[in-house]
Amino acid sequence: MATTVVAPPGAVSDRANKRGGGPGGGGGGGGARGAEEESPPPLQAVLVADSFNRRFFPISKDQPRVLLPLANVALIDYTLEFLTATGVQETFVFCCWKAAQIKEHLQKSKWCRPTSLNVVRIITSELYRSLGDVLRDVDAKALVRSDFLLVYGDVVSNINVTRALEEHRLRRKLEKNVSVMTMIFKESSPSHPTRCHEDNVVVAVDSATNRILHFQKTQGLRRFSFPLSLFQGSGAGVEIRYDLLDCHISICSPQVAQLFTDNFDYQTRDDFVRGLLVNEEILGNQIHMHVTTREYGARVSNLHMYSAVCADVIRRWVYPLTPEANFTDSTAQSCTHSRHNIYRGPEVSLGHGSILEENVLLGSGTVIGSNCSITNSVIGPGCCIGDNVVLDRAYLWKGVQVASGAQIHQSLLCDHAEVKEQVTLKPHCVLTSQVVVGPNITLPEGSVISLHPPDAEEDEDDGQFSDDSGVNQAKEKAKLKGYNPAEVGVAGKGYLWKAADMNTEKEEELRQSLWGLTINEEEESETESERSMDSEELDSRAGSPQLDDIKVFQNEVLGTLQRGKEESISCDNLILEINSLKYAYNISLKEVMQVLSHVVLEFPLQQMDSPLEANRYCALLLPLLKAWSPVFRNYIKRAADHLEALAAIEEFFLEHEALGTCIAKVLMGFYQLEILAEETILSWFGQRDVTDKGRQLRKNQQLQRFIQWLKEAEEESSEDD
């Protein structure tokens, strides 16, 4: 199902004529010049108004990420203002999750007025599951006619892409359309607050042409491997850069959408970049980069980035996108600016003795009691703050009520949340819409409270991408289930997002996903972690056709390897068969690695009727690893791939505890066959966020001896260097 907001007839062409002086020009010789040099077509943009991940759950269970208010303005409004300011005249907004809310917001905004310089067309579908699906739809509908900008709806930027666009077009003109994408980066030190650890990248680039030669997410690693071929034969030299912030803004040729159609395993932009760099010699396509030093660009991928970008807006680093500029033309968002970055909306009341220290935004109609201390905080419209309240790096959305004596530190309170008397919120707490906490309670650091009970999440997962996916069922369950006063206070309303069987690891995982406190090997992206869905997201799709496809794909891979062993089929042909299965079942690269690792480790068990003891299992497995090592090396290339394979190996040995004693031999086999690198094995072994069983597995004496041997080998290698 798809809907489109149709622009006024001739709107794009009329506006293009106005910008270009109209048909025929305004003076003698205009027609001749037009004949000699055709003016570029109107600039288009593809705006993806969905992240295709759950990084903002449970906040985004109530409203989509692109409508979350940042400094009291919806995120998508920042993105559209950036696109319009940079010269975009037509934007296709693709929506999936909560599409009706996004559509309603846009239709009421200035972007859908006849006078808008940027014609916004809204396309909705419940079938989109990734950026790849969106771009395949762009190609199927033939929406883009020339180079276009590709952005997510949570990008905040003031970058003028004109120069980058000119460079991109010139490259394509001189090199016969070889360059298909220009990625925009901002020069930024690794310690900068707006550097999102999950998006940190190391880039190898041709010094003369800015052509990207290698692109790798750091995944928390400190050492990286680069193909030797990068440094051979490059006349101008190669730069290795770790001082870049990915703005998630890309200039794309129409070929990009076509390449996503041709490669169904491309789900994210990272998949696309990786695929093109790996196959550059075969496909002949190149990717370039443009680096800005003074302008601003960032993506709000988690609450850490939300806090950092919001602070930058308040501190005026994103000028001219400042709160008092009111670029949305909404009377409700008008405000004044004074010293120390204090912004006040209309009809704000400030009680006696209350202090607004610095970097504070007060929304319209907000009432603040006496003797309050507020610093580095944003308060939405219609909020009511009691007496003696302390707000430090607090983000309050519309209609929030905070009673007297409350203290809120580095936390987020969504629409119409209520904090009772004498409540303290430690850092990184989240109260979603209409939650009530208190009185006289302290919420520990990282507490997430929602009116949606966590155990209702699984019931909603089957329809998680539709507008009303089980919401009514969840509310009914909430009515039947009482709130826990120990968690939310005697007058509280809400559920601590901790199911009865959720262990400490999963609680930490929830905090990480919201605030991005630690490295998450997954995203990307998409989450922009963005390569593919993690195991939790796969679980959430129980009963979906995709899971059935993965099971069928696993059986097909098993059959392929069995036939390969029996008929001595070459590894090159096995790779071709696995690739054809991958395309047939629309399986992501990560899922291929998971399935391949699982199938090969299970293979000796599949061939025997009786249980195998550890030594016999190793004797059967290691020759298979040697025979199929080229297949593994074909799919395990990046550091993230190594860690995914190690996670699959760990999962196998946790499921088969009787074989646990031979994990060291298996890892040694992977290492000696150059499938897994020593630094990634050490990184995996040193992971702190593991289950009790995972910790027990790491206490295996043979495994610890192997790890010690690896460390000594690494130290000897470093000394030799």
Curated annotation (Swiss-Prot):
Q: Fill in the PTM field for this protein.
A: Phosphorylated at Ser-544 by DYRK2; this is required for subsequent phosphorylation by GSK3B. Phosphorylated on serine and threonine residues by GSK3B; phosphorylation inhibits its function. Polyubiquitinated, probably by NEDD4.
Residues annotated as carrying Phosphothreonine in the record are T322
Q: Where is this cross-link: Glycyl lysine isopeptide (Lys-Gly) (interchain with G-Cter in ubiquitin)?
A: K61, K103, K141, K217
Which stretches does UniProt call biased (Basic and acidic residues)?
Answer: 528-540
Pfam families, per database record: LbH_EIF2B, W2
Localization recorded for this chain is: Cytoplasm, Cytosol
Q: Where is the composition biased (Gly residues)?
A: 19-33
Keyword terms = Acetylation, Cytoplasm, Initiation factor, Isopeptide bond, Methylation, Phosphoprotein, Protein biosynthesis, Ubl conjugation
GO CC annotations?
A: cytoplasm; cytosol; eukaryotic translation initiation factor 2B complex
Question: Disordered: where is this region?
Answer: 1-40, 446-478, 517-545
List residues modified as N-acetylalanine: A2
Q: Where is the W2 domain?
A: 543-720
Function, in words: Acts as a component of the translation initiation factor 2B (eIF2B) complex, which catalyzes the exchange of GDP for GTP on eukaryotic initiation factor 2 (eIF2) gamma subunit. Its guanine nucleotide exchange factor activity is repressed when bound to eIF2 complex phosphorylated on the alpha subunit, thereby limiting the amount of methionyl-initiator methionine tRNA available to the ribosome and consequently global translation is repressed.
In the record, the note on similarity to other proteins reads: Belongs to the eIF-2B gamma/epsilon subunits family.
Protein name (database record): Translation initiation factor eIF2B subunit epsilon
Which organism does this sequence originate in? Oryctolagus cuniculus
Per the UniProt record, the lineage of the source organism begins with: Eukaryota, Metazoa, Chordata, Craniata, Vertebrata
